[in-house]
Regions:
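Conserved donor-binding/catalytic core segment of Leloir-type glycosyltransferases
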Residues: 191-210, 216-221, 230-231
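N-terminal strand-loop element at the rim of the active site
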Residues: 11, 32-77, 108, 235-241
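A charged, aromatic-enriched C-terminal amphipathic alpha-helix characteristic of glycosyltransferases
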Residues: 14-15, 330-375
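Nucleotide-sugar-dependent
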Residues: 282-298, 310-312, 316-317
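Nucleotide-activated donor-dependent transferases that construct or modify glycoconjugates
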Residues: 1-14, 201-202, 281
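Nucleotide-activated donor-binding/catalytic signature segment of Leloir-type glycosyltransferases, i.e.
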Residues: 243-271
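A short, glycine/small-residue-rich beta-strand->loop->alpha-helix junction that serves as a flexible
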Residues: 7-21, 44, 207-210
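Glycosyltransferase donor-sugar binding loop
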Residues: 229-245, 263
């Protein structure tokens, strides 16, 4: 099949870019011909293994650097162009003989726009992907999904581990599992080889409101039976955050086994850092991650790393797979005891983590994603 991936969002390098790469590479793997279908002058962040077709209707509209009032104007402009792109996609599908169109990052606004364009009458399947629907969005999503039901070639695919639509009677909505994120061209230790010291990796952007001292105090107090190392990365964007992280480094410089990385990790460097630890600590997650899939959680699975994670972060994963634990964040003492127990029992539980990471990688595979999208 010739499958067009209609991408109209300019994204920084991150999991959105990687999601498009997953689609392209797995479509190729399964014998399809992917095509990137994008607005004119689209600034690709990476090179995809696909040819590119361009939409009529103008360039991508971004909010970068815009103030509150400018964003209001730009949102209207973006909506107008989105409808132009969808009309153009309808024409391109005929001219270029596409067999299907995938819109990889959609919202209810995309459905609303699509219903005002020729694309709703597409003769080929149009698969709109939604990366989770939170309670605040649900009513709007259901309203637009119902309006879309008469158009039988428009398929709404919600990536989720929940079932929040069972009573809504939406025959055009399918719930599909998220895919894992895997390293590119780097070996993965699927055996979870036991090494000394056991290395815990705490990665991410640091902001002053994040209470990393909580975790450092717990690590400092913990009594471990095996050698342990904690790598704490702090990627900082603001001067005040950078100064505060430097202060933390100074305060905890005498704690044995703690290594601070005050730097950004991008691309291969990020992947090597994740592959270089034994366990990932991901303590921060907003409530929305109960409804939207967490890139960090599915990166840990794809990299075969057990995870100590925020309780809000896709709890269904830990309910079905023994790949880590939800963090006890009530107090430093409580987390200290959890950390001690987790680390000290790791050598004995490693085999179970290994088995369940393999099972999770199968359930959340790229192959299953494409088959759940286009059959």
């Amino acid at each position: 099949m010739k499958v067009a991936i209609l991408e109209s969002i300019i994204m920084p390098a991150g999991h959105e870019v990687e999601f498009d790469r997953i689609l392209v590479d797995e479509l190729v793997q399964q014998g399809h011909e992917p095509v990137m279908l994008v607005p004119e002058k689209f600034p690709f962040k990476i090179k995809y293994n696909a040819k590119t077709d361009y939409l009529d209707g103008g360039e991508v509209v971004t909010y970068a650097g815009a103030n509150k009032f400018e964003k209001l104007f730009l949102s209207i402009k973006r909506e107008y162009r989105r409808k132009k792109w969808f009309d153009s996609a309808y024409q391109k599908s005929i001219e270029n003989n596409y067999d299907a169109i995938i819109i990889p990052t959609s919202t209810y606004r995309y459905i609303r726009s699509l219903l005002k364009t020729d694309l709703k009458n597409s003769n080929i399947p149009v698969y709109m992907i939604f990366h989770g629907i939170n309670p605040h969005e649900k009513d709007n999503f259901v309203k637009q999904a119902r309006k879309c039901m008469p158009y039988k070639n428009i398929h709404l695919k919600v990536i989720t581990l929940r079932d929040d639509f069972k009573n809504d009677g939406l025959t055009n909505v399918d719930l599909i599992a998220p895919p894992v994120f895997k390293p590119l061209d780097l070996p993965v230790d699927k055996e979870l080889t036991l090494k000394e010291p056991l290395t815990l990796g705490f990665f991410g952007q640091y902001r002053r409101e994040k209470n990393v001292r909580f975790f450092l105090d717990a690590f400092k107090k913990a009594k471990f039976n095996i050698p342990v190392k904690l790598i704490m990365q702090g990627a900082t964007a603001r001067t005040e955050d950078s100064e505060e992280f430097d202060k933390i480094i100074s305060e905890y410089s005498d704690v044995p086994g703690v290594e601070f990385w005050h730097k950004n990790l991008i691309g291969p460097e990020w992947q090597k850092a994740l592959l270089g630890v034994d366990v990932i600590i991901a303590p921060y997650a907003a409530e929305r991650y109960r409804y939207h899939w967490s890139a960090m959680s599915f990166t840990a699975i794809g990299f075969y790393k057990p995870i100590l994670q925020s309780p809000e972060m896709n709890p269904e994963v830990l309910e079905h797979f023994n790949v880590g634990e939800a963090l006890a964040l009530d107090s430093v003492d409580k987390f200290t005891k959890q950390l001690e127990k987790f680390v000290n029992e790791y050598p004995d539980k490693r085999a179970k983590y290994k088995d369940d990471l393999a099972k999770a990688n199968d359930i959340f595979s790229h192959e299953r994603l494409i088959k759940s999208l286009i059959g």
